[in-house]
């Protein structure tokens, strides 16, 4: 079972709230989040309720201020435990929506879609095995989006505002 602790103030100070299940941040008294401690597994945290807004992947470790998880502000309103996956990882990315156009199958991390596949946009995705994080920019930078097994017919389905994808990586729990 995963465990994550949210703190109102930087440096793990102020009121805290422990969580071990999805979407546990519905507490009205918890108004801001400036530091996080991830004790077990990997989590995705979201700026807004119901898994919306900016998304951030956090692996086991300490995040003493929101800038450490690339946060834009101190707002975290929902979270999701990323299930452990011990098998193979596989996804198919498509250059156009509804699984049309050039298709590339990926089984490992890719720091630059441009260098590897000559792509800067991905419009649809089929995640066949494992969970993945796609990043807006190369080298795992920019906005992040969690893709779990399933079909994403257009970039809006994974919460993006455009089809720009620079890199992607498998969600692996190393602890």
Curated annotation (Swiss-Prot):
PROSITE patterns: CRYSTALLIN_BETA_GAMMA
Protein name: Gamma-crystallin A
Chain intervals for the UniProt region annotation (Connecting peptide): 84-88
Keywords associated with the record: Eye lens protein, Repeat
Species name: Bos taurus (Bovine)
Similarity remark: Belongs to the beta/gamma-crystallin family.
Function: Crystallins are the dominant structural components of the vertebrate eye lens.
One of the protein's GO biological processes: lens development in camera-type eye
Molecular-function GO terms, alphabetical: structural constituent of eye lens
SUPFAM superfamilies: gamma-Crystallin-like
InterPro entries for this protein: Beta/Gamma-Crystallin, Beta/gamma_crystallin, G_crystallin-like
Gene3D superfamilies in UniProt: Crystallins
PANTHER family linked: BETA/GAMMA CRYSTALLIN (PTHR11818), GAMMA-CRYSTALLIN B (PTHR11818:SF101)
Domain commentary: Has a two-domain beta-structure, folded into four very similar Greek key motifs.
